[in-house]
Amino acid sequence: MDLRLHWLARTLADIPEGDAWLGARERAILSRLRFSKRRSDWRLGRWTAKCALLAFRPDDFPAMPALDILAAEDGGPEAYASCGGAVDVSLSISHSHGRGLCAVAPGKCAVGCDLERIERKSLERSISS
């Protein structure tokens, strides 16, 4: 069994036009998001997570529309195959400034990732302190 943590990054420019790659449950969630930035970030997170899952375990997952990335009870992302229920992986999704990051680990475990832009102003303050 693969016990390594995998990660993959994507950008807004990588997301295909339209929503055909989203599952029915995901499209329902997307339709309830009112603000365009929230919709854009949400789509980026789902695209990045699906690409990560398919890149690291391509034989284990269905095509993108049959793979849903939904919020678990604790609010974290969880993968579901539309024909088989929850997928036995752990996910973490982060997005910032038009870039998305997804960490994937096999099985159920605590996994996390965070993507933030380092601002030059912040570095100058840290150095002068």
Which residue stretches match the model-derived regions?
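Core catalytic alpha/beta fold that binds nucleotide/phospho-ligands
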Residues: 1-129
